[in-house]
Swiss-Prot record:
GO terms for molecular function: L-lactate dehydrogenase activity. It is found in: Cytoplasm. This is L-lactate dehydrogenase. One of its GO terms (biological process) is glycolytic process. Substrate binds at residues 88, 94, 126-129, 154-157, 235. Gene3D superfamilies: Lactate dehydrogenase/glycoside hydrolase, family 4, C-terminal (3.90.110.10), NAD(P)-binding Rossmann-like Domain (3.40.50.720). The modification Phosphotyrosine is found at residue 226. GO terms for cellular component: cytoplasm. Pathway: Fermentation; pyruvate fermentation to lactate; (S)-lactate from pyruvate: step 1/1. InterPro entries: L-lactate/malate_DH (IPR001557), L-lactate_DH (IPR011304), L-lactate_DH_AS (IPR018177), Lactate/malate_DH_C (IPR022383), Lactate/malate_DH_N (IPR001236), Lactate_DH/Glyco_Ohase_4_C (IPR015955), NAD(P)-bd_dom_sf (IPR036291). NAD(+) binds at residues 18, 39, 46, 71, 85-86, 107, 124-126, 149. Homotetramer.
């Protein structure tokens, strides 16, 4: 950064359920020293109220400057996190949100870039893989500095579900969901392990779990958002903590391996889409993808998932407005 500031600054765009939960997670975990919250003009006072409310927790956590921000405040930010978008309603898929949220995304990204922002974009609005792609297109930024939350939450759900099934700590379960953050995602069963022990071997030694149970477990993970939306209207706590984890990895230059929306350049036979796979992430964004050697069935699922995303992108980019706004 060219600014003289000596601390880490995050700008959050979108103070809805996900955004405010993310802000709360940052405060609780002591992540970043400055947090600006941007909302549309008619909701600016909500951002003011949330900033004030969050500031009252600082005496219990760690110092942080929190305020309702403007787009001009993005200029010297290290990270801009986009959660703003139309929420997913009962019965809607994430891909149903494309039309509404691409227009919102274009407006946000344009204003952030116009501020002189030179940091990293982190996208969480849905459909996240498509909106990560559009953020890259509309910003003109290098692909390494545009990151989507990808399958980070899905993988956490998968690990927790396996942990409950096996009666172990989820932190000892190493397993990934890859592909679209949505209906075409898939479990990487071939590399799932418990403390380094292949899942299949672990199951042999510990208990009798049938294949049908594992299929049902994955389906529960895949459909978790629908379950939660039908019961309480929206999902926000899990994704908020996932975003906080990604934020910490970036701001602390951890070079952590996390499952994110990553630009594909031929890995798994996929190109020119952002899609969920593990990647090394640090202060400069995506350092490199971690290309897990998938088996043939998993590779086919990755390609099928990417094909679905590509079809959505191709259809959306028939809109001349999006074509004209593209810088990549």
């Amino acid at each position: 950064m060219t600014s003289t500031k000596q601390h880490k600054k995050v700008i959050l765009v979108g103070d809805g359920a996900v955004g405010s939960s993310y802000a709360f997670a940052l405060v609780n975990q002591g992540i970043a020293q400055e947090l600006g919250i941007i909302e549309i003009p008619q909701l600016h006072e909500k951002a003011v109220g949330d900033a004030l409310d969050l500031s009252h927790a600082l005496a219990f956590t760690s110092p942080k400057k929190i305020y309702a921000a403007q787009y001009s405040d993005c200029a010297d930010a290290d990270l801009v996190v986009i959660t703003a978008g139309a929420p997913q309603k009962p019965g809607e898929t994430r891909l149903d949100l494309v039309g509404k949220n691409l227009a919102i995304n274009k407006s946000i990204v344009t204003q952030v870039v116009e501020s002189g922002f030179k940091g990293i974009f982190l996208v969480a609005a849905n459909p996240v893989d498509v909106l990560t792609y559009s953020t890259w297109k509309f910003s003109g930024f290098p692909k390494e500095r545009v990151i989507g939350s990808g399958t980070s939450l899905d993988s956490a759900r998968f690990r927790q579900a396996l942990a409950e099934k096996l009666d172990v700590d989820a932190r000892s379960v190493h397993a990934y969901i890859m592909g679209e953050h949505g209906d075409s995602e898939f479990a990487v069963w071939s590399h799932a392990n418990i403390a380094g022990v292949n899942l299949e071997e672990f199951l042999k030694d510990t208990q009798n779990v049938q294949e049908a149970e594992l299929i049902e477990l994955f389906e529960g993970v895949r459909d978790a958002a629908y379950t939660i939306i039908n019961k309480k209207g929206a999902t926000y706590y899990g994704i908020a903590v996932a975003l906080a984890r990604i934020t910490k990895a970036i701001l602390d230059d951890e070079n952590a391996v996390l499952p994110l929306s990553v630009f594909q350049e031929g890995q798994y036979g996929v190109e020119n889409v952002f899609i969920g796979q593990p990647a090394v992430v640090g202060a400069h964004g995506i350092i490199r993808p971690v290309n897990i050697p998938l088996n043939d069935a998993e590779t086919q699922k990755m390609q099928a998932s990417a094909k679905e995303l590509q079809a959505i992108i191709d259809e959306a980019w028939k809109n001349p407005e999006f074509q004209e706004a593209s810088k990549n």
